Swiss-Prot record:
Binding, ATP: 646-653
Gene Ontology biological-process entries: mismatch repair
UniProt-annotated stretches for the region Disordered: 904-927
GO MF annotation list: ATP binding; ATP-dependent DNA damage sensor activity; damaged DNA binding; mismatched DNA binding
Composition bias, Basic and acidic residues: 915-927
Gene Ontology cellular-component terms listed: cytosol
SMART domains recorded: MUTSac (SM00534), MUTSd (SM00533)
Function: This protein is involved in the repair of mismatches in DNA. It is possible that it carries out the mismatch recognition step. This protein has a weak ATPase activity.
Lineage: Bacteria, Pseudomonadati, Thermodesulfobacteriota, Desulfovibrionia, Desulfovibrionales
Keywords, alphabetical: ATP-binding, DNA damage, DNA repair, DNA-binding, Nucleotide-binding
Name this polypeptide is given: DNA mismatch repair protein MutS
Membership in a protein family: Belongs to the DNA mismatch repair MutS family.
Amino acid sequence: MSEPTFKMTPMFEHYMSIKADYPDALLFYRMGDFYELFFDDAELAARELQITLTSRSRDPNNPIPMCGVPWHAVDTYVAQLVDKGYHIAICDQVEDPKTSKGLVKRAVTSVKTPGTVLDDANLSTKSHNYLGALCPGSDAEKGGFAWLDVSTGQWSGVDFRRQTELWQWVLKMAPRELLVPEGFQPPARTLLEGIRLVRLPLSRFDLKRSTERVLAAQGVREAAALGLEGREEIMRACGALLAYLAQTQMRSPEHLQPFLRLDLSRRLIIDEVTERNLEIFTRLNGRKGKGTLRHVLDETMTPMGGRLLEDMLRHPWREISPIVRIQDAVEWFYVDDGRRTALREALNGVYDMERLSTRISLNQGSPRDFIALRNSLAALPQVFTALIEPTTSLLLRPDQEKDASENTSQENGLTQPRALTELLKTWDAMEDCAQLLQSALVDNPPPVITDGGLFKSGYNAELDRLLDLAEHGEQKLQAMLAEEQSTTGIAKLKLGYNRVFGYYFEVSRAAHSGTVPYHFIRRQSLANAERFTTEALKNLEEELLSASDKRKALEYTLFQDLRQHMADQRERIAHMAQLIAHLDYWQSLAQVGRLNNWCRPGLETDGNLTIREGRHPVVEAMIGRANFVPNDFRLDEKRRLCLLTGPNMAGKSTVLRQVAIICLLAQMGSMVPATSARLGLVDRLFSRVGASDNLAQGQSTFMVEMMETARILRQATKRSLIILDEIGRGTSTYDGVALAWAMVEDLSRRAQGELRTLFATHYHELTALEGRVDGVFTMNIAISEYSGDILFLHKLVPGPADRSYGVEVARLAGVPGPVVQRARAILANLERGRDVARKAVVSAVCLPGIDLPETGPEEDMPVLQAAPPRSEHPVIELLRQIEPEELSPLDALKTLMEWKKLWSAQPGSAEQGESPDKHDEGKNSRG
């Protein structure tokens, strides 16, 4: 910030002293009805907010840049700046300017940052807004990471033994701000992912102070009560979070929920790369919303339910027991349309109880926040009724009945699930709070507390009296006038008012100069009249003139008392918010399953996987169910690694993703898009799909691909599920084949356990491993050819594809005809040696211990040398000569029968003992 070169006024001296305490924040300085910014802050704010930049100074040679915004609109402008990543310090007037002497006292009342905002304008309704803290361990490879959603009070932490995994988790949780110790240098990619780093002094990460902060915030005496005993890195990170929160909120964080250390041994681990590749939260182009898995699954009715859905998508279970509890609850709503509909209608009246409670607890709740909370509490009885009342709309069709499984606690689909029973045991209708808010607040209160008009009549006797004065003051004055007229007998007694004397009685001098009663006090003499007051009139005048201010002051006090009372109920509110979130989550999964005719999957502890008529939920939602081709897929002890081949655009990537997504959905407790499914639990889900590069870090597409693949090979366990798509692109063909081959070898060895892999490739050389390497099998996406055109059938069939049809796809994409024709000629020339090349590669790189058939002279030919021409079958020549358009249906049938006989009689045909290898190569997916 530039230093002023003029003699500063007391106001600017005060401004500069406050600015010195918040050098990294834009200081909004309250002056009357505006918040003003000066110097560099003003120039930046004017540019970002597109408001007028002016100046303020008595010295024209040293103008002070200045801009300002009205106090009543400050939240809108602050929200824009926070959304752009700026820190904002709000400096308010902390005393009444009317009663102050000299400079009005001002102080910073809050600091708003991207990771600590509470205003709805800066928050996504159904997504968390995380503040993160990372603490590296004494061992360079260790570290702890904690994250906190200030708006809800939820916070968690995790530690890792490897920095790479730690940073993967940071990128996965994507905090708006990340607190790190001074001098710590994170990976460059973190800076490119939109994560703002905030460097704090090392003292904020001190273990002793951090432990004291955390234990005090949670109200416990030992770290073991929080699962943090011996986990110093997480404790330090949590301490830094609390210190930063106290600094920005100007108070200790009393609204935090119990800390949850995330036990990864109980969760399906999905890293940030896999989330992106599966388009769980964002599409590959980075956009959210339509086209993502979350968008398909989100039938939640409340913000809390939406955020729980987000949590479960990030951290599904890997244990059968909690999954089945969710499945039972989901199915209970799935089969009962009437109950589910009633619950959805009731939940529609529930607002964001978590965030409302937080704002109220931190003294930032507006009157309208209280109304939203009141309406939410008022909806709880309707929610409860929807859960307990019997319904008659149960629909159980054979295709919707759950797969019989010993892992379920239900017998007939009607029994109340255990999870719901336990939920209802802790149900708190909060009738006392609902009645209090209902009796206290008007339905449409003003947005600002100090404006008054917040409370209903009957809530407070003194307030009612002041309201009566404010609303009926004129009537009281007229009643007093009438009483005095009657008492004094002066029928023409008048009541008047001026700014000098206030209210007065006026008596005509000519008519009543000698009849004025003794209790009249003379205030003013005029030529034709006398003006008087009385003690009663003075008292009434004082009450009338002060009633408005007294009413506003009393309402402010009453509102603060009400706020404190509701803040004291924050644990009850948070508990009910969690119950509502779970109900909403269950009904949302049931609604999605019902609308799309999904099934309940069976769960196993082995590595098997069987999916019947599986579909990709997002693709199906985009193109319509009628246009989506479902597929069966199976993995078992003999089929662990699937080599998937087929043309471009045939749907290989869709098949890969849909298998992974079905496993993910199952471990969330959701129904799955299939006719039936039995799935072995997965501990880690890995995906390497699609092309990407990172030019900012000098990383090519191939480099990024290899880095992600290396991570998968290092971190995968025997219970993981891996989907790999087109490994080895971006380099020479031989390099790509060699790398892909070696990876298949490595994964095949691990597949002797329970590791499951789907490997899509255009390197058809790899398909030779089927039958030669245990666990490896091939499948392909079928197509149909007719008159030189290809039709994508999108059907998964056994065996390898014979070619990739890349030239045909290029033609469909609009590549000019001459280029396509030339490509066909070159391809035909290359393919003459294709079979020879494939066998030569297999012979050259066969795995130790794998017995390959002995190769004859033809198989020893160079890889790209064409094979000698073979004699054509007579049927081929007949096929060339025929004119199909000239044949009648009967002639065509006769011709086909003749060809069949000729084919069977020709030596060397499949029916006459053609070699098994050639017969296998003849089986492709085109029809």
